[in-house]
A protein has these predicted regions:
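Thiamine diphosphate
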Residues: 1-172
Length: 172
């Protein structure tokens, strides 16, 4: 199984049915896999904080969901975490495809990558970086269970070591 197929299986095992996302190349296998599987309800959002609001509303209605985004999209999320998700005790699951590392060319991605983890720490939001197929299912499963049990959000950061990252072409 590919990393994305394994990830979707873990979501099913944890009753996660709603997949909200802002389109991203690295996340395409997850997005397409969820869209092609009748178990999941996929909803495209225009912004990451909008996707988080959709997941929050779904949680209040009894439906469990996740938000898929890339690193730069995380920049709009801290206010939604601090003003809605954390105080309302919503166990939102955020999945971030990591850019800004390992040869990144886009300074915007680099800057957000540098502040993402310190921002999550400042908000007391749990986060885990997924780097390999062997540990990924365990970390995802336990992170979802902990988020639900503690009514707290969790951020799962998908390292390029797991996903292969975005392929860059060198310009000469």
């Amino acid at each position: 199984m590919t990393w994305s197929e394994t990830f979707l299986t873990v979501l099913k095992n944890n009753d996660i049915k709603l997949v909200t996302y802002v389109p991203d190349n690295v996340l395409t296998p997850l997005i397409k896999g969820a869209a092609d599987d009748p178990y999941f309800k996929s909803v495209v959002a225009t912004r990451e904080d909008e996707a988080l609001g959709i997941v929050a509303g779904a949680w209040m209605a009894g439906l469990h969901g996740i938000v898929l985004m890339q690193t730069s999209g995380f920049a709009v999320v801290p206010n939604a975490l601090a003003s809605l998700i954390v105080p309302s005790q919503i166990p939102a699951i955020l999945v971030v495809s990591e850019r800004g590392t390992l040869g990144e060319f886009n300074i915007g991605q680099v800057l957000v990558s540098r502040v993402m983890r310190p921002t999550l720490d400042a908000l007391a939001v749990a986060h885990h970086t997924l780097t390999d197929d062997a540990t990924m299912p365990f970390i995802v499963d336990r992170s979802i269970k902990q988020a639900v049990a503690t009514q707290s959000p969790v951020v799962l950061i998908l390292s390029p070591l797991l996903t292969g990252g975005k392929v860059f072409t060198e310009k000469m």
